[in-house]
């Protein structure tokens, strides 16, 4: 996918990985970048606008845990304004295994609902033009961090949802792939709670392992966007971008 002159919606585009990715996207010259985030950050929006004045940056407050109908209403507002959208990035995520329901709601259900909502505008069975969805999942969807089983399970669920949608591309006309960062130096991983406090030092122990910067992750994220490979399971770890070959142990045969 060519980012230049495209219209992009980025859910949670002002967070750690999100903000650096927004910066890299803006440098590539899209026509519009629409940022949906729970928390407004006027300074970050101003920075993005200054980075490339030719790009129109728009912000809408959005909590991914709202009902599906509210998400559809917001997307209708955006589509009415832009007419077309080329790429949806689902990037909302929390890491706190003491908040079980919210972890699942943000990391999994929010991704499902936002993706489902945009199908009203993209699905070729409804006369839509198709589009592209990039879901930010996690390497914990491959192998869990067992001290945070709720977080790991939510990301595994998001990954499974994403790979399923990719197999429906011939029906919907929508390309779908996953972005799976490894341990990245963000606020998210500097302090978080394990499930039932099984490991009070989990964040500290995790950061003893090799990490990557948010900039390294963002630069590889843009490469994955440009590759635009339906069904790709991208691992973004230690400053590298690698396509993961999923081992199949069972097949529905459908």
From Swiss-Prot:
One of its GO terms (biological process) is alcohol metabolic process. Pfam families: adh_short. The active site is at residue 151. Substrate binds at residue 138. Keywords: NAD, Oxidoreductase. GO terms for molecular function: alcohol dehydrogenase (NAD+) activity. The keyword Transport does not apply. PROSITE patterns: ADH_SHORT. One of its GO terms (cellular component) is cytoplasm. Its EC number is 1.1.1.1. It is an enzyme of class 1 (oxidoreductase). It catalyses: a primary alcohol + NAD(+) = an aldehyde + NADH + H(+); a secondary alcohol + NAD(+) = a ketone + NADH + H(+). NAD(+) binds at residues 10-33. Signal peptide: none annotated. Belongs to the short-chain dehydrogenases/reductases (SDR) family. Homodimer. This is Alcohol dehydrogenase. The lineage of its organism: Eukaryota, Metazoa, Ecdysozoa, Arthropoda, Hexapoda.
